[in-house]
């Protein structure tokens, strides 16, 4: 009875919306950021090992950002996937296959599969229940790795990881030269993927689910399948991050599964700004450098300044560093404080209509 | 109900009983509406008007009866499937996505059809002016427009409006009513309108039902009910010309 058939009346839903297309465009500051990631090669060649740690942590934080920042899934056990990937990569190498790239893929798939199984539980809960579940899951996996010492080496760590050169050409060296560019390229590739993902309609749906899952259902998007998808993807990414750590350090310790790691990565993301693509990256840089520096200044109490930093950020920049910067830019441009003087908001104008 | 169209109804409720958990809110609700029809649902607070819409969307527990949508039984269908099949719901609480911009609030709901971003902005020009504003920066009236526009973006065959005029300034009410009238009478969008402003609701719609304690107590053509002061007075306590106090 409808006058037009909805299927033929309008352009296909896959045609990109202009504002989504605009978000995909690269900004100058992004080029600057990625060029700056090459600086350590020149400026601080002694710190390439730290730089590769930062890149790994950034990838891990990015994966947490996908679920926490964009889909609103709280997790206190994200290290489970990082550690699972780390052990998977280590074992593959120990069992005689030391090729790094395929090792990465295998580790990612293993962690992704674990994430996929876990996602069925995750999609059923929110908020506090999620914190408990992810926390418990992380602890379970840690103890499992601890007790399966025949497989994992237990508290002694996994021995005998031997990586072949990347692409058969570049050996992992003592100075972390190969390690850094390897970690950086992996980070960049996954960053591109994440960027594409969150600027897609799927990414927008995730943000809708974060804001209001019931409402999303009422406009036709069931949250369960979306959450399962992003959780699996995030687990894959976390697994790859863990694998890069294994491959660049050629060892795996129980620390990869530790609760401390789950907590740290949460702190890093909040520090940088959750729900922002660069939040985890910036957070990782600041946190890791601060940790390195503070522990050099005072090896015993280096967590103290970290705590101060955290409290300061939460008090003064509730949306993280990037959130604070965005607010600052808004203020400087006068959008927030003075904008309405030069161009009155529409409700003022229509209110004065006769 | 009087319907010019004897073909299959767009929607029919058959002896529906529904509620939340143990509580039964609606009992033995039956009505049907034709394609392009419009129904006003009137009644005092707490008689189950919103629950009727929630039941249609699948957010309550349905104990008995069935809901037929375009010839298909959707009684057990998940809410998102109902939305996909063409039922658009504008909740009383509006439930704007606070941290998405106006444009994102709309595009997140987009589904192919006549209503796209441009059409929605044509319909509510004010939203276009505020397209980059976050949901939580909008005024109440703008939020209501956005909630309505967002439901339209799903290109619904039937729009459920839950007290769209609640708490809005008169000038905004006027603008919104103008929009709704255009939608219902000119464009023939099927609408179920829950509203406290009985006169506005009746002037917008073709038919009306009156709810009392979870049951339909009166069916009428809206135009007739508008003149039937006695009935309105009895069921909604509308203060009409004769000045009788509302019956308890």
Per-range role (PLM):
Chain B
Residues 57:
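Helix-to-loop junction immediately C-terminal to a conserved catalytic motif
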Residues 65-73, 85, 115, 119-122:
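Conserved ABC transporter NBD signature motif
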Residues 151-152:
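ABC ATPase C-loop
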Residues 174-187:
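Helical segment within the ABC ATPase nucleotide-binding domain
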Residues 134-138, 142:
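Conserved ABC ATPase signature
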Residues 42-44:
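The feature captures the beta-strand-to-loop junction immediately N-terminal to the Walker
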């Amino acid at each position: 009875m409808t006058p037009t058939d909805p299927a033929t009346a309008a352009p296909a839903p896959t045609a990109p919306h202009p504002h989504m297309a605009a978000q995909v465009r690269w900004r100058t500051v992004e080029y600057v950021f990625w060029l700056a990631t090459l600086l350590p090669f020149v400026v601080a060649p002694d710190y390439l090992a730290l730089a590769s740690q930062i890149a790994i942590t950034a990838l891990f934080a990015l994966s947490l950002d996908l679920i926490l920042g964009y889909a609103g899934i709280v997790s206190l056990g994200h290290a489970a996937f990082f550690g699972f990937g780390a052990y998977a990569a280590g074992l593959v190498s120990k069992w005689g296959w030391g090729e790094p790239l395929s090792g990465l893929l295998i580790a990612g798939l293993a962690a992704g599969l674990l994430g996929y199984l876990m996602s069925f539980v995750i999609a059923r809960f929110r908020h506090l229940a999620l914190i408990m579940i992810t926390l418990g899951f992380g602890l379970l996996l840690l103890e499992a790795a601890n007790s399966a010492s025949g497989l994992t080496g237990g508290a002694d760590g996994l021995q005998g990881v031997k990586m072949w050169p990347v692409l058969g050409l570049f050996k992992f060296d003592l100075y972390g030269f190969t390690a850094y560019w390897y970690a950086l390229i992996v980070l960049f590739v996954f960053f591109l993927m994440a960027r594409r993902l969150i600027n897609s309609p799927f990414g927008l749906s995730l943000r809708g689910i974060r804001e209001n899952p019931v409402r999303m259902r009422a406009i036709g998007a069931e949250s369960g399948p979306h959450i399962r998808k992003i959780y699996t993807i995030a687990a894959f990414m976390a697994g790859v991050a863990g694998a890069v750590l294994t491959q660049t350090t050629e060892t795996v310790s129980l620390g990869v599964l530790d609760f401390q790691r789950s907590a740290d990565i949460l702190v890093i993301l909040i520090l940088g700004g959750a729900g922002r693509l660069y939040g985890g990256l910036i957070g990782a840089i600041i946190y890791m450098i601060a940790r390195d520096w503070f522990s050099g200044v005072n090896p015993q109490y280096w967590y103290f300044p970290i705590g101060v930093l955290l409290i300061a950020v939460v008090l003064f920049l509730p949306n993280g560093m990037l959130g604070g910067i965005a607010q600052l830019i808004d203020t400087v441009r006068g959008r927030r404080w003075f904008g309405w003087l030069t161009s009155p908001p529409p409700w003022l104008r229509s209110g004065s209509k006769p | 109900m009087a319907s010019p169209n004897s073909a299959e109804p767009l929607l029919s409720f058959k002896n529906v009983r529904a509620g939340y958990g143990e509580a039964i809110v609606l009992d033995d609700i039956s009505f049907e509406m034709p394609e392009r029809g419009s129904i006003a649902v009137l009644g005092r607070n707490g008689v189950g008007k919103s629950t009727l819409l929630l039941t249609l969307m699948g957010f309550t527990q349905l104990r008995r009866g069935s809901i037929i949508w375009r010839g298909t039984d959707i009684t057990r269908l998940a809410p998102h499937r109902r939305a996909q099949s063409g039922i658009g719901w504008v909740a009383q609480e509006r439930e704007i996505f606070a941290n998405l911009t106006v444009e994102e609030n709309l595009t997140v709901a987009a589904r192919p059809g006549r209503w796209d971003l441009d059409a929605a902005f044509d319909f509510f020009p004010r939203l276009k002016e505020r397209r980059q504003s976050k949901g939580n920066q909008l005024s109440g009236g703008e939020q209501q427009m956005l909630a309505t526009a967002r439901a339209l973006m799903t290109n619904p065959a039937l729009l459920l409006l839950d007290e769209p005029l609640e708490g809005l300034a008169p000038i905004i009410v006027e603008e919104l009513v103008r929009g709704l009238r255009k939608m219902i009478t000119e464009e023939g969008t099927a609408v179920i309108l829950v509203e406290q402003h009985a006169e506005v609701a009746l002037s917008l719609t073709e038919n009306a039902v009156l709810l009392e304690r979870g049951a339909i107590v009166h069916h009428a053509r809206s135009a007739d009910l508008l003149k039937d002061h006695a009935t309105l007075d009895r069921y909604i306590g509308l203060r009409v010309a004769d000045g009788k106090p509302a019956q308890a």
